[in-house]
């Protein structure tokens, strides 16, 4: 009876450890994502200031979705080709969260201003799973 109890307990412990390991692997499988904007030319500097002078910054909106800015700069060193005049990158836990960030009312307004004041492109890059 004692042996049967020990075997049953060992099997249950193995199932529990296996389930925890599968959950851990599943959690690691989702790669991070990066929301990226490259501005190649600012056509209307005064109009573009409307983005930088907004009362609520993109960092606050990104933070609500678990994201954070990793670059927001005009200090760019070209290695090959013509560099953008401004570069923005924001890291998120997933492509879905990066897309949700781009679909917020805040970003829709920013994108509309950027579309009329700059020559730019924006995209989401899927990163490597950790």
Model regions: which residues?
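Short S/T/G/P-rich N-terminal loop/turn motif that feeds into the first structured element of a domain
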Residues: 14-86, 92-99, 126-130
